Every structure is written in C-alpha cells, then in structure tokens.
C-alpha cells in the first residue's frame, strides 16, 4: 500500500491539471504560432513558466486504484499487476483466466 500522502499528492495534481488545462493549451498555442510577434510569444512563455509545476499533465503518475502502487500499473484497468492477479484469482475480473499449458 502506498503512502496516503503520495496518493493525495497525485490526486491534487490531477485536479490542478484539469483546472489549468484550458489556460495551458491557450498559452502553448500562442507560443507555437509563428505568425504572432516575438514579444507576445515571449510573454506567453513567461506566463506559462509562472504557472504551478503540478498543473502540467506530465507530473501525474499512473497509480493503482486499489493499492496506490505507482509501478507496473495497467492503463486500461488502472490496476497494478498485483491487484489484477489478486482479483483474477478470486474471479472478480471478467474474462481473466489463469494461464496453463
């Protein structure tokens, strides 16, 4: 089980990213637009750099919904390999069958 603080920190980052996404996208569009004057693009770059670091989507860590584990998490299920194995052995994951050959 991951520390509660790590899980909460990641949830805070998700909320911040969701709230700041439109503003970040607008600033990035201004920066990428070469037809805009250099001063305006530079001002947008400064505004973007003043925004909180945690409002960037790259700061979000994929974590297991059950355990909070950060490594070996399947994106499709949002579960770690350990949680999938545990739930699968109990028959709680539809379509998951233990392999044997």
From Swiss-Prot:
Regarding protein family, the annotation reads: Belongs to the universal ribosomal protein uS14 family.
In UniProt terms, what function does this protein have?
A: Binds 16S rRNA, required for the assembly of 30S particles and may also be responsible for determining the conformation of the 16S rRNA at the A site.
Single GO biological process annotation from the record? translation
What is the gene name? rpsN
Enumerate the InterPro entries for this protein. Answer: Ribosomal_uS14, Ribosomal_uS14_bac/plastid
> Where do Basic residues bias regions lie?
11-24
Q: Which organism is it from?
A: Rhodopseudomonas palustris (strain BisB18)
Query: Keywords assigned by UniProt?
Result: Ribonucleoprotein, Ribosomal protein, RNA-binding, rRNA-binding
Instruction: Write down what this protein is called.
Output: Small ribosomal subunit protein uS14
Compositional bias (Basic and acidic residues) at which positions? Answer: 1-10
Q: Which GO terms describe its molecular function?
A: rRNA binding; structural constituent of ribosome
């Amino acid at each position: 089980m991951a520390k509660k603080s790590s899980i909460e920190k990641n949830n805070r980052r998700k909320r911040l990213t969701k709230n700041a996404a439109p503003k970040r996208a607008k600033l990035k569009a201004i920066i990428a637009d070469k037809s805009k004057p250099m001063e305006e693009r530079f001002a947008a770059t400064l505004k973007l750099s003043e925004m909180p670091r945690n409002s960037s989507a790259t700061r979000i860590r994929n974590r297991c919904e059950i355990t909070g584990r950060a490594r070996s998490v399947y994106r499709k299920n949002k579960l770690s390999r350990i949680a999938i194995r545990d739930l699968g052995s109990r028959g709680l994951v539809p379509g998951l069958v233990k392999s044997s050959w």
